[in-house]
Regions:
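Generic beta-strand hydrophobic packing signal
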Residues: 8-10, 244, 275-278
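Non-catalytic alpha-helical coupling and interface elements of nucleotide-dependent molecular machines
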Residues: 103-106, 222, 291-295
Length: 332
């Protein structure tokens, strides 16, 4: 599958701080790629470099094989862009802003814009200043789609919209991707984009924590839950540990890239009961990735706080000590 959007070690520095730090992205043709993260994660700055509004301080960014900064003018006719807070001449009507913008584009823009206005159920005679947030966002999307772009980039497109409009807006993205367009959108509303995204990338503090297709994510990050008798298993033997906790005889861990052979062996071990492996939703994955990103080396995080790796060894030693000849019976 062709790669439409690509970055390599993309970096942007403001005031001596890397707000985008060596980001590597690969977005295939026809994908709906959701760039997810909280405010200040670096999503908007990444998008500004992709749309030619900011030069990169290091690394590269390309769309359709063209450099996003050096070839920005050529890409303007092939890439539609809707910023987080679009601003138009609010004294114009919906029809006027289309007529005005058509002067900067090739023939065909005006009739496509008129069709989109009708499709989005906008009143052509309504002044922009009278539109709701949802209506204003639809005007921005119509202007971005009217040039018939191959790629669509949306920065927080559902910010400030009510629930019904957000769902309607995101559903329209599926139609556009089905028609062959490649879409990259940023959002901090992780749960709402899960229903439409085919690929996701998680960002925090300028870094890309993980990027993959939804299908791949379901396999790469899982929650393993079990009950144990005797010695608790060491989660570090089963893959990269993002989260881990025990409560009594209940043991559970969130693992990235689980070791399948080790998990199969664990199922056969005496004293291991009710082992379950479950996929996570995007919000749970992002929480687990942030937990791993923020904790110091040598420390494992749980939902109850931080636990050092040695705690598992100490727990095992305690069990062995309780089972030595002459000791008290284990209080299991």
């Amino acid at each position: 599958m062709d790669t439409i959007i690509a970055t390599h070690e993309l970096t942007k520095i403001f005031s001596g701080r890397a707000v985008v730090n060596r980001v590597n992205l690969s977005v295939p043709q026809g994908a709906i790629f959701a760039l997810l993260g909280g405010n200040g994660a670096g999503k908007s700055t990444t998008i500004k470099m992709l749309t030619g509004l900011l030069p990169a301080d290091a690394g590269t960014a390309t769309i359709l094989g063209e450099d996003c900064w050096a070839d920005a003018i050529d890409l303007r006719y092939r890439v539609g862009y809707v910023p987080e807070r679009p601003r138009f001449y609010d004294w114009m009507t919906v029809r006027d802003i289309g007529w005005f913008t058509a002067g900067f584009h090739e023939a065909g823009f005006a009739p496509r814009y008129a069709d989109l206005v009708q499709r989005f159920r906008l009143d052509p005679a309504a002044r922009l200043k009278t539109l709701s947030k949802g209506g204003y966002a639809k005007v921005g999307l119509a202007l971005a789609l009217a040039p018939d772009p191959e790629v669509l980039i949306l920065d927080e497109p559902t910010s400030g919209l009510d629930l019904f409009i957000r769902r309607e807006f995101l559903a329209s993205m599926v139609e556009l991707a089905g028609a062959g367009r490649t879409i990259l959108l940023s959002s901090h509303g992780i749960a709402e984009v899960e229903r439409v995204a085919s690929h996701v990338g998680f960002m925090a503090e300028g870094r890309l924590l993980l990027a993959a297709s939804i299908e791949e994510l379901r396999k790469r990050i899982v929650r393993v839950r079990l009950h144990f008798d005797g010695l608790p298993p060491d989660p570090a033997d089963l893959g990269q540990v993002l989260q881990f906790e025990t409560s009594g005889r209940l043991w559970q861990a969130v693992l990235q890239d689980p070791n399948r052979l080790a998990l199969d062996d664990l199922r056969q071990q005496t004293g291991i009961r009710d082992l379950e492996e479950m996929p996570l939703c995007l919000e749970e994955i992002y929480t687990a990735l942030l937990t791993r990103f923020h904790r110091p080396e040598g420390v494992q995080a749980t939902s109850n706080g931080r636990v050092r790796k040695s705690e598992i060894r100490d727990q095992k030693s305690e069990v062995r000590s309780k089972n030595r000849p002459g000791s008290f019976f284990p209080d299991f």
